[in-house]
């Protein structure tokens, strides 16, 4: 089954970007490289159930088992010891990346309360976009009754764009609802 966003990129977006930015070579056209989903769980140091529930939530959202990130050094102020699980990360590529982006644009973002669009100011200067979500219940796979605590997650969309303008145009073409 061909992915709709991937087909859209190959058939329409490439041509539009090539016209707009006047690329001489098709390899200059920006494309998506990967999407990284990250969740920091400081409270997981004390409560292992938090880590398990978050792993299940992120696996349901992304369709891929998350990798546990561990602390590199002890920080007394945060009550964290070295080598303790404090977060989860998933890197999506190829078809899963396009599936997740489609779900994010068409299902999750419109479910945010008082949603008017996402900010275009969180590009990093190299065409990569960062998005922070405050609650995981906007995804259709997460049932509100099964959630013990509202936790957010960070999403990074990595592109081959040379600058923010190219990255913004690429994501707008995919249908990202910028304000």
UniProtKB/Swiss-Prot annotation:
Gene3D superfamilies: 3.30.1440.10. It comes from Gracilaria tenuistipitata var. liui (Red alga). Its main location: plastid. The keyword RNA-binding applies. One of its GO terms (biological process) is translation. Pfam families: Ribosomal_L5, Ribosomal_L5_C. Part of the 50S ribosomal subunit; contacts the 5S rRNA. The lineage of its organism: Eukaryota, Rhodophyta, Florideophyceae, Rhodymeniophycidae, Gracilariales. This is Large ribosomal subunit protein uL5c. GO terms for cellular component: chloroplast; ribonucleoprotein complex; ribosome. The keyword RNA-binding applies. Keywords: Chloroplast, Plastid, Ribonucleoprotein, Ribosomal protein, RNA-binding, rRNA-binding. NCBIfam families: PRK00010.1. Binds 5S rRNA, forms part of the central protuberance of the 50S subunit. Belongs to the universal ribosomal protein uL5 family. It is found in: Plastid, Chloroplast. The gene is rpl5.
């Amino acid at each position: 089954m061909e992915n709709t966003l991937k087909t859209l990129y190959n058939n329409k977006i490439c041509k539009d970007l090539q016209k707009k930015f006047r690329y001489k070579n098709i390899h200059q056209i920006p494309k998506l490289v990967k999407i990284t989903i990250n969740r920091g769980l400081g409270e997981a140091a004390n409560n292992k159930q938090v880590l398990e529930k978050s792993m299940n939530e992120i696996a349901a959202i992304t369709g891929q088992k998350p990798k546990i990130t561990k602390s590199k050094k002890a920080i007394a102020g945060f009550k964290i010891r070295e080598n303790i699980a404090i977060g989860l990360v998933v890197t999506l590529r190829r078809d899963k990346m396009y599936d997740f982006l489609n779900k994010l644009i068409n299902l999750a973002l419109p479910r945010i309360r008082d949603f008017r669009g996402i900010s275009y100011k969180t590009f990093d200067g190299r065409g990569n976009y960062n998005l922070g979500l405050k609650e995981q219940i906007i995804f259709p796979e997460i049932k509100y009754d099964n959630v013990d605590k509202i936790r957010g997650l960070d999403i990074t969309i990595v592109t081959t764009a040379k600058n923010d303008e190219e990255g913004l145009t690429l994501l707008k073409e995919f249908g990202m609802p910028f304000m």
